[in-house]
């Protein structure tokens, strides 16, 4: 793919990435025109989509009152952070990528790296804050309702930015090597070994471990609650089939006087009658009978089931109830499996996207400073790894907002409003 790659030469520059640079990569500042055009179109499209997607999420939360809750405040803050990445960081990163050299000066380079590390770290830590909020909500739903306040969300958001500052500021205060500023055509983050470990573990590896633990526990808790619901429903059905008591046997007439219409116990209401907790036969002078059966279920209301019966034999054998219970239990099992599969799919998308976008970059970012002289990073591969990390700011609003029906409805309202204005 020669047209997509810079023309190779003898000079070496650093492969630019979300944290400034990954390390040494072979290439020169003179690049092919086709590479510049195609790269500009691709990166311009990515930046435009990232800005538009995150701006729509912020607008939806600001305009739609039903979306203004603590959980969505975290998603909105994530969208603001990714919007900052898209507006403040990606344009300079794209210019660096297209020209294959840094042309904006050392002061702008320091500012670019600081903003890059700050915003990308805060974006990653927002994902941890969302995972932590969901973990508390599903494992302690009763108490957390009162604890889930805007102040708590503000504290989590402030913590993500504080950690981002603590990771981005040290290189500006001198935690770097002399070689970091030796090449005026390169804009590199500190290659100091201590800072490399500090920044990569603080910005990615520790948050990754935390997210894996939290979402693992969320999955176990969700699966336990789903299966507990199914078992509870099955237990109710079993209790209803076995919990049968004989009906009372009143001998008085309805109005308390002899000769009136009697209520007598029907034989089908005895203990042998399945699902019947009480049964009585109303017998008139003409010999016609009507049995009224009350079916009691734990935690539900009574069901009055009038059944026409013959005068001599009135069985209580509602086999259709048993079949209905079995069908209901089977339907609930299928629904539980579907919910469990959906939970696995959702958590898989969240963690899979995060790992796919960031793990390759942070592996290279951790390894390259320790083997700078012997390791080689091809220019094209370095660019793909770098922009894979940046693309997480485009995918976050899709995962956390656009799959949500409430957000979808808000987006439709925004679009319809625009159409109305055009008319």
Swiss-Prot record:
Taxonomy, superkingdom: Eukaryota
Compartments reported by the entry: Cell membrane; Cell projection, Dendrite
Residue spans, topological domain Cytoplasmic: 60-73, 133-152, 217-346, 404-423
Activity control note: G-protein coupled receptor activity is regulated by lipids: phosphatidylinositol 4-phosphate increases HTR1A-mediated activity.
Glycosylation site residues: 10-11, 24
SMART domains: 7TM_GPCR_Srsx
Membrane side Extracellular: residue ranges: 1-38, 99-107, 175-193, 371-378
Positions of transmembrane segments: 39-59, 74-98, 108-132, 153-174, 194-216, 347-370, 379-403
Motif (NPxxY motif): 396-400
Location of the motif DRY motif: 133-135
Positions with a binding annotation for 1D-myo-inositol 4-phosphate: 345-346, 352, 403-405
Disulfide bonds: 109-187
Known function: G-protein coupled receptor for 5-hydroxytryptamine (serotonin). Also functions as a receptor for various drugs and psychoactive substances. Ligand binding causes a conformation change that triggers signaling via guanine nucleotide-binding proteins (G proteins) and modulates the activity of downstream effectors, such as adenylate cyclase.
Family affiliation: Belongs to the G-protein coupled receptor 1 family. 5-hydroxytryptamine receptor subfamily. HTR1A sub-subfamily.
Subunit structure comment from the entry: Heterodimer; heterodimerizes with GPER1. Interacts with YIF1B. Interacts with GPR39 and GALR1.
Protein name, as recorded: 5-hydroxytryptamine receptor 1A
Species the sequence originates in: Canis lupus familiaris (Dog)
Organismal lineage: Eukaryota, Metazoa, Chordata, Craniata, Vertebrata
């Amino acid at each position: 793919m020669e047209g997509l790659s810079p023309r190779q030469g003898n000079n070496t520059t650093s492969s630019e990435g979300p944290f400034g640079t990954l390390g040494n990569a072979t290439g020169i500042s003179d690049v092919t025109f086709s590479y510049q055009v195609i790269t500009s179109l691709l990166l311009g499209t990515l930046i435009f989509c990232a800005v538009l997607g995150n701006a729509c999420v912020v607008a939806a939360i600001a305009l739609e009152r039903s979306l203004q809750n603590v959980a969505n405040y975290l998603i909105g803050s994530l969208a603001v952070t990714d919007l900052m990445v898209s507006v403040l960081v990606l344009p300079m990163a794209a210019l660096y990528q297209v020209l294959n050299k840094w042309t904006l000066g050392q002061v702008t380079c320091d500012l670019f790296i600081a903003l890059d590390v700050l915003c990308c770290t805060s974006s990653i830590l927002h994902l941890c804050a969302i995972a932590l909020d969901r973990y508390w909500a599903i494992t302690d739903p009763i108490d957390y309702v009162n604890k889930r306040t805007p102040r708590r969300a503000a504290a989590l958001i402030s913590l993500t930015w504080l950690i981002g500052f603590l990771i981005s500021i040290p290189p500006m205060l001198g935690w770097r090597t002399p070689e970091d500023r030796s090449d005026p055509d390169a804009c590199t983050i500190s290659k100091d070994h201590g800072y490399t470990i500090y920044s990569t573990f603080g910005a990615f590896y520790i948050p990754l471990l935390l997210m894996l633990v939290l979402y693992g526990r969320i999955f176990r808790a969700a699966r336990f609650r789903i299966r507990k619901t199914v078992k509870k429903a099955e237990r109710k059905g079993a209790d209803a089939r076995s919990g049968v008591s004989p009906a009372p046997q009143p001998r008085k007439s309805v109005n308390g006087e002899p000769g009136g219409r009697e209520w007598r116990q029907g034989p089908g209401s005895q203990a042998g009658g399945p699902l019947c907790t009480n049964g009585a036969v109303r017998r008139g002078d003409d010999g016609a009978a009507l049995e009224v059966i009350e079916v009691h279920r734990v935690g539900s209301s009574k069901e009055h089931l009038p059944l026409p019966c013959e005068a001599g034999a009135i069985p209580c054998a509602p086999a259709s109830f048993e079949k209905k219970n079995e069908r209901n239990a089977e339907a609930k099992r299928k629904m539980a499996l579907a919910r469990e599969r959906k939970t696995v799919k959702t958590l898989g998308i969240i963690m899979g996207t995060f790992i796919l976008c960031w793990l390759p970059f942070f592996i290279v970012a951790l390894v390259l400073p320790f083997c700078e002289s012997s390791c080689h990073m091809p220019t094209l591969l370095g660019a793909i790894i770098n922009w894979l990390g940046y693309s997480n700011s485009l995918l976050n609003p899709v995962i956390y907002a656009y799959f949500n029906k409430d957000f979808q409805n808000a987006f439709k309202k925004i679009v319809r409003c625009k159409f109305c204005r055009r008319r």
